[in-house]
Amino acid sequence: MNATSDSGDLDFTKAFDSPAQPAPSWEASSEAQKQEVTAGATELLKSGYYITIARKAPKVAPLQHDGRYSILCIDDDTELLKILARKLSLDGYVVRTAFDRQSIVAELQKLPPPHLILLDVGMPDISGLDLLQKLRQHPRLGSVPVIMLTGHVTPESVLHGMANGADGYVSKPFQFEALGTAIETVLGIQ
């Protein structure tokens, strides 16, 4: 199966054909919500703390047959992927990983789609923000919650990610407790 279109863009349409509900956009957020995110991100960055922002996704797919959530971790740092996979597995999640364009396409074509995607912003062969936009436009994957992971956090980058449909933003390096809280928030786990 050809995973890329002639233009080299990622093409997931051949793997999925059922429509999904579109994710709410940043533009649909109230001005108060936007100001809260902006102010919070700015203050955290000024104080030197790392930033973690997460909002509950409007709709999360049903649990797998074994009652666990599945998470797809996408990052070009294979060592970080190993650590994430081990830690998240110990926390009870089913974890899949992808580290380059080919493995990303292969994982996104699998059924069922993941309940959550952890997505690195800065990868060498594809921008995490570009991939996020493609995911949000995809009929089958558009409603899958996405938490962005990045080492380059500015208020503008956070706003750009949230405006393009990210459900959360976690800066690297991160503490697993902060990432775990963001995951639980987005998935609605109490």
Language-model region placement:
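Acidic catalytic/metal-coordinating carboxylates
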Residues: 99-100, 127-133
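Active-site residues of response regulator receiver
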Residues: 120, 150
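Acidic, metal-coordinating helix/loop segments flanking the phosphotransfer/catalytic sites
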Residues: 97-116
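C-terminal output helix
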Residues: 174-184
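Alpha4 helix (beta4-alpha4-beta5 surface) of REC/receiver domains from two-component response regulators
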Residues: 130, 153-168, 181
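Charged docking surfaces used in two-component/phosphorelay signaling
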Residues: 82-90
